[in-house]
């Protein structure tokens, strides 16, 4: 294997959603170089950051019925029972919610936490307050999915944040998803909430780092001898 090939293998691909932004930063950098070289170098740094933001690395997803996988890179910010948003149609009783906060330095491609069929997609406009705040789940712009699985209906909510102003969805109602499959992204910092049906046992705690498509958030088969899984 050549050195060049080894280097390329370590550089994650860029998601196509990022091309216009990276191109814009690069063009602005050229103009800044023309105006004053130090400003141009600042533009180069911002262009590199933008490319890193839209990186889309390959992930190895644990596969077994009953596992719930992290839908986003970031930090687990909340693990607590709350009443899910009304648009999910999951009832008015508290369900276990696991929240992952994504900073502007995290990869922002979102992946399905489970394998199943998309039963519902609901978009709701809203504000852009700090996504780390609990009230962001009620006040902020969000896009919600309900995924039907053998373990029950899983709610996944993309929440825009203080900097994030655009939620992008790649899927439609009725489509089937594989665990770890890409289903959307949020531009420039945000939060993902996962609502578990009864019986899901969280395996993460607040402050833990989550890796989209790899970290196991919860398991519906704890106590059933079903902890063995494979990776695809």
From Swiss-Prot:
The keyword Lyase applies. InterPro entries: PS_Dcarbxylase (IPR003817), PSD-A (IPR033175). It is found in: Cell membrane. The keyword Lyase applies. Pathway: Phospholipid metabolism; phosphatidylethanolamine biosynthesis; phosphatidylethanolamine from CDP-diacylglycerol: step 2/2. Keywords: Cell membrane, Decarboxylase, Lipid biosynthesis, Lipid metabolism, Lyase, Membrane, Phospholipid biosynthesis, Phospholipid metabolism, Pyruvate, Zymogen. Pfam families: PS_Dcarbxylase (PF02666). One of its GO terms (biological process) is phosphatidylethanolamine biosynthetic process. This is Phosphatidylserine decarboxylase proenzyme. The gene is psd.
């Amino acid at each position: 294997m050549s050195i060049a090939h080894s280097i390329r293998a370590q550089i994650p691909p860029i998601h196509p959603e990022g091309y216009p932004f990276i191109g814009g930063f690069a063009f602005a950098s050229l103009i800044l170089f023309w105006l004053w070289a130090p400003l141009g170098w600042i533009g180069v740094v911002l262009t590199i950051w933008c490319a890193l933001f839209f990186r889309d690395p390959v992930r190895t997803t644990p596969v077994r019925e009953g596992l719930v996988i992290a839908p986003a890179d970031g930090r687990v910010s909340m693990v607590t029972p709350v009443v899910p948003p009304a648009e999910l149609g999951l009832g008015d009783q508290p369900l276990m919610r696991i929240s992952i906060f994504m900073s502007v330095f995290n990869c922002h491609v979102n992946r399905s936490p489970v394998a199943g069929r998309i039963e519902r997609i609901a978009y709701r406009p809203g504000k852009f307050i700090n996504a780390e705040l609990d009230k962001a789940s009620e006040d902020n712009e969000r896009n919600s999915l309900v995924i039907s699985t053998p373990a029950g209906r899983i709610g996944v909510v993309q929440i825009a944040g203080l900097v994030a102003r655009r939620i992008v969805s790649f899927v439609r109602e009725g489509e089937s998803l594989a665990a770890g499959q890409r289903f959307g992204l949020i531009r420039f910092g945000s939060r993902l909430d996962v609502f578990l049906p009864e019986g899901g046992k969280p395996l993460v705690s607040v402050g833990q780092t989550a890796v989209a498509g790899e970290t196991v958030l919860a398991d519906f088969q704890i106590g059933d001898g079903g902890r063995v899984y494979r990776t695809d």
